[in-house]
Amino acid sequence: MALLEICCYSMECALTAQRNGADRIELCAAPKEGGLTPSFGVLRSVREHITIPVHPIIRPRGGDFYYTDGEFAAMLEDIRLVRELGFPGLVTGVLTVDGDVDMSRMEKIMAAAGPLAVTFHRAFDMCANPFNALKNLADAGVARVLTSGQKADAAQGLSIIMELIAQGDAPTIMAGAGVRANNLQNFLDAGVREVHSSAGVLLPSPMRYRNQGLSMSADIQADEYSRYRVEGAAVAEMKGIIVRHQAK
């Protein structure tokens, strides 16, 4: 049966995903940055209270995936922490300035991760040649690749995703970016074995007093009075589609 991974940005989101049938969680912070390394407090709380597999993301900042030596050193320390806390896997990605997988740094990441399953995240979609990148990641021992097929969303990139799946069984290709209940069946019919979804919704902040003339964000257009949450009904609907597909 296809595996459903849900991207979560808090303990509350992780609990919602687990209750509604998620098979695995990618744990992140900072949804507006596309996901950054969670804090120690969030990592520890989730490790203690969530029973399904959780893979934290290791990403020190938003933007591109070419990191300074200092940023990369911090990533290795975060990997060691995730390993010490007992998580079964992690999610990360590093590129060279030319858009190739940084194999030298991936070797260090794999050594630091040890027995943990490593997912190479959507840095893959920023690679110059996805097929060369996949071969390199297979050589590195990466367990899976999260990809939209190098398109804005996975529905647009499905043909490339299918080509990547045809390359072989390792790493597993996980489709993500815009995967929802209304298009999930297309991925299942195409033979995608793992899917990744945010299943997210923005809810209004409970704050009654709002200083509309002041922003705490560098982006003055940012809505600071909305909060990201995983929508339990969306997770349950996707899990139901997967179960029915398996029963065919």
Curated annotation (Swiss-Prot):
Family statement: Belongs to the CutC family.
Source superkingdom: Bacteria
UniProt entry tagged with the keyword Metal-binding: no
GO cellular component: cytoplasm
Gene of this entry: cutC
A molecular function (GO) term: copper ion binding
Assembly and oligomerization: Homodimer.
InterPro entries referenced in this protein's UniProt entry, alphabetically: CutC-like (IPR005627), CutC-like_dom_sf (IPR036822)
NCBIfam families in the cross-refs: PRK11572.1 (NF008603)
Protein name: PF03932 family protein CutC
Keyword Cytoplasm on entry: yes
Biological source species: Salmonella typhimurium (strain LT2 / SGSC1412 / ATCC 700720)
Record's keyword terms, sorted: Cytoplasm
Pfam family, one: CutC
Subcellular location field: Cytoplasm
